[in-house]
Amino acid sequence: MHRLLLYNFLVTTLIAPASISANSNKIPTYRAIYDVEYKNRSVGESEITVKKKESNDNYVFSSKSNATGFLKLIFPKTLIEVSEFSYLDNTIKPQIYSFSDSSITNSESYTISFNWEKNLVNTTINDQVISSEIQPNTLDNGTLQVALMLDMKNSVPESYTIRDDDGARVYKYTSEGEENLETPLGIIATKKLMQERQGFSHQTIIWLAKDLQFIPVRIEQFRDGKQRVVLNINSLKWLTIDD
């Protein structure tokens, strides 16, 4: 669950971009809690937070997932993703991204540092540093969600390129129409997207709240046509710089 749940949470994009039009240039800051199901069983919760830093104009996206029940024995620690990024001239630029997972069956962590002056990234895994080139507008798994929320104020993006420990990934999006969802927050009008990676059997359906800054309120992940992971929003709080 660990990798499927957060790597692909909103998972995860350059053709239509992290460059946002001027009338959509405010980044929502918030905290959302999601209930997580795996193969139709409740397995934990995930907390997504986007905050603005006090010290500079950067923002921080963080995602924390905790297992419950019997899975707590296998995944006793919190799975954490953190992305610090800048947002200037309507462009999102990741600065540093980290992923940490320590479970009984798997222990993995890595860090990606972005050098936009040289268009390079340094990926650190187990004290080994790998440098590689990146294209403009490349995102990470955290800034992907932020870019998607901003772009959806205008239209459905065609694709995004993200960088993770496996290199560059391109995800494509298609509209699946609109749907009203019943949630703990009430009935929410959503736009429904399909996310796919070419050549892979994974698919993700995302419901984005039209009147809540396009925050995702439901995510379903499929593998080989079978539903695997479902995230449903449970609570939402808008944040200020003092929170």
Which residues does each PLM region occupy?
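Bacterial N-terminal signal peptides that target proteins for export
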Residues: 1-9
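N-terminal signal peptide c-region/cleavage motif recognized by signal peptidases
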Residues: 16-19
